[in-house]
Amino acid sequence: MVRFESTDSLMLARQLPNKTVALILAGGRGSRLKDLTATRAKPAVHFGGKFRIIDFALSNCLNSGVRRIGVITQYQSHTLVQHIQRGWSFLNEEMNEFVDLLPAQQRLSTEQWYKGTADAVCQNLDIIRRYDAEYIVILAGDHIYKMDYSRMLLDHVEKGAECTVACIPVPISEGSEFGIMEVTADYQITAFYEKPANPPPIPGDPSNALASMGIYIFNADYLFKLLEEDNNTPGSSHDFGKDIIPQLTARKVVWAHPFDLSCVTSNAELPPYWRDVGTLDAYWRANLDLASVTPELDMYDRAWPIRTHMEPLPPAKFVQDRSGSHGMTMNSLVSGGCIVSGSVVVHSVLFPRVRVNSFCTIDSSLLLPDVHVGRSCRLRRCIIDRACHIPEGMVIGENADEDSARFYRSEGGGGVSDSGYAGKVRGKIEPLGFLFVRLDLLIRLSLLIRLNLFIRMNLLIILTLFFKLASIQASH
């Protein structure tokens, strides 16, 4: 649970969100998620059975009291915009509450879209200034976590910082994937390295490095000044991690905020939970984390709800098929509109409107919305993208060589499939993981099966006619 040192601190923390605007960077492509982001931005990817990834950042804002939010979009934004319009339009504009969509519009140049995270904010400065906020919270729209931003705002104000960066320890072997910082005993940042090849360890903890979570708080006027300076700096990549934050360390105005101070947990014994789901393996594991008996991320905490767009769907249904086999599930999440008939689902996540027909086994897999699984299929360690139809009798996840020839095989060794009709299967094999199953491939396999049956039927008809003609001629 988030704790405050005194009543005065608590009162100040409750006031600060009213002076704050949150900006969610939601324009990223997320290319490491392969075909999951072929037709949608990474923050719009489905997660946890019924949510989109961006719902976590949006819910954290509302639960923290920050009710003025800008969502900066760019790549494949239609699905994301549609989701926000349908699920996040309940805020009261008369009370100056809003979720404002900020698409890329080439405001500063007719030749460039957003060149970096800082440029994405800079190109919207005319709008952001009109929000008239004292503090700007900048968030990534593609992380899974629960955090009270009011606690971080309090830390920012009490330290007199111009900028505060949320941080979390990560294994030193993973440090090259993050922005890594060095800090003093009171968490003033003295050095910042964006994705260093050799990340410096935390003093006294050589197995971990201190990583940026991509969450920043700025004093608004100071941020505007920084962005204008950066925009006029030749050679800048216009990125917070690469340019803005490293520059501030020399000025001694930037501080780190440990995530464990503001992480929201319903059980004090649970460790702080934050996941960057930027790869297929990380995405698969984070989803299955929620299906654990005691998940580290508590989605049942009514004090900190994760909101989303709710479709009017009937409850999930588990039925006995005509042979007497019972539909059943264990250690799984099953969403509304799903029907499991005479099959077994183990340690998996079924998203809305999934249909699993008889005699199937689904193990450690993610079935995204509208997936249809034919009879007698076995799926293990798979991600099946939206609207895929798995042909009857298909087996995925049991033979590495066959899977790699048909589907994308993740770095961890599993596989995935997408809902596009044109695209090549690529992949590499490693010890663990899952399969990403592509719809275009399934269509081809299904067509081959049907073509095979069609050819056999026609051959049978031709042979029958041939023998009939032969017998007629023989009788004459």
Curated annotation (Swiss-Prot):
CDD domains with a match to the protein in the record: ADP_Glucose_PP (cd02508), LbH_G1P_AT_C (cd04651)
Pathway: Glycan biosynthesis; glycogen biosynthesis
Catalytic activity field: alpha-D-glucose 1-phosphate + ATP + H(+) = ADP-alpha-D-glucose + diphosphate
Organism: Yersinia pestis
Record-level Gene Ontology MF annotations: ATP binding; glucose-1-phosphate adenylyltransferase activity
Top-level taxon of the source organism: Bacteria
Complex formation: Homotetramer.
Protein family (similarity comment): Belongs to the bacterial/plant glucose-1-phosphate adenylyltransferase family.
Gene: glgC
EC number: 2.7.7.27
A single GO BP: glycogen biosynthetic process
Chain's role: Involved in the biosynthesis of ADP-glucose, a building block required for the elongation reactions to produce glycogen. Catalyzes the reaction between ATP and alpha-D-glucose 1-phosphate (G1P) to produce pyrophosphate and ADP-Glc.
Name of protein: Glucose-1-phosphate adenylyltransferase
EC primary class: transferase
